[in-house]
Amino acid sequence: MAAEEGKEEPGLDQVEEEFSVWKRNTPFLYDLMISHPLEWPSLTLHWVPSTPIPYAKDPSFSVHKLILGTHTSGSAQDFLMVADVVIPTPDAEPGLGGRDQDPIVPKVEIKQKIRVDGEVNRAQCMPQKPTLVGTKTSGSEVFLFDYARLSAKPQTSECDPDLRLMGHEDEGYGLAWSSFKEGYLLSGSQDRKICLWDVSATANDKVLNPMHVYEGHQSIIEDVAWHMKNENIFGSAGDDCQLVIWDLRTNQMQHQVKVHEREINYLSFNPFNEWVLATASSDSTVALFDLRKLTAPLHVLSRHEGEVFQVEWDPNHETVLASSGEDRRLMVWDINRVGDEQLEIELDAEDGPPELLFSHGGHKAKISDFAWNKDEPWVISSVAEDNSLQVWQMAESIYREDDEDHDEEGNQNAQHSNENQK
């Protein structure tokens, strides 16, 4: 994920000007916008997969939980953090930040800090036991913490995980729990290895070795992901530009294909369609593939200016996905709109391809991570290197379609205002 050599970075004045334009347009672009400053930037962000609870002070709001981490660069103690996010329920009156007449506004509150050794690169909750968090840091070990057993503030000066998962020789970012096989955790790192653990297995002195180590990549492994329909299939991607599909039943590669000319930073399997997956690459594109024919992409999404570091399918809409990159933009795409005719006016062409639904420009630095909220459709959280945490939902008028066809004029005006932030 190295920065592209010779690429000119935008100046501070340009960044501030773009942010100012975005901020002025915020009331027109969003139905929800929470911006929360963090003490330290977080490289990771994950919605806890548990049922939201009603907010005690007002049942028209609900409380969701987020997992975050700190990235202090050695300047201070690092922590894994659990936050409460208070947002309006779908039945609450729409409006920026909830109902204007209500004294309760959406907010983020850090509720728990867990001491870790090293900066938190990636943290993911186990689907079958959401309080159990797999944590990759700047060290080679993967930690498991059950935050339900820990107090809100650290009671010890040492890192005390429930399990230490061994097998790697270097740090990394790839981490994925199986939604089918309880306790199965994948990890990919800079040592070119993929480790698989069954954390329900008996450990000796809270240390667990992998049940299998997969090797085949020729460079750093950037990401690993489980197939969303087949419990035995997972994928990996890395700096060797290779997309690899693995099968647990044989512990062998099923496919190994060079699908980009530059590093692949992320992959995501579609949660609805068993054949479709997406990759994010340093070549500035997001590519869509059919598992039955990986030699050529189904479609390439091009709008980012610079490396693309992440891509995630929307868990609530089959044709919607989002991507983020070094251009400080988080873009939402609807591939159902690929091939739609654009209005033949200059503004429409400036807005990008018809499948580009929305471009979020609320961060002043590279976006480190983002996550869709499965319980609240169209709600996304994102964190960036400028210490900002944002929870947001684009205006309904942007994604809503009329029964017969798109509301072309409304969508065009909203998207044009949205793109003015660029």
Kindly give the residue locations of the regions a language model identified:
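Per-blade loop-tip surfaces of WD-repeat and WD-like beta-propellers in eukaryotic adaptors/scaffolds
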Residues: V86-P90, Q101-V105, S138-D162, E169, ...
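Hydrophobic alpha-helical hairpins/lids featuring a short glycine-rich hinge
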Residues: R122-A148
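Intervening/peripheral non-core polypeptide segments
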Residues: L175, I220, L288, D369-F370, ...
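Terminal intrinsically disordered, low-complexity extensions flanking WD-repeat/beta-propeller proteins
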Residues: A2-N121, T131, L150, E305-V308, ...
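Long, low-complexity, intrinsically disordered N-terminal extensions of eukaryotic proteins, enriched
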Residues: M1-A2, R249
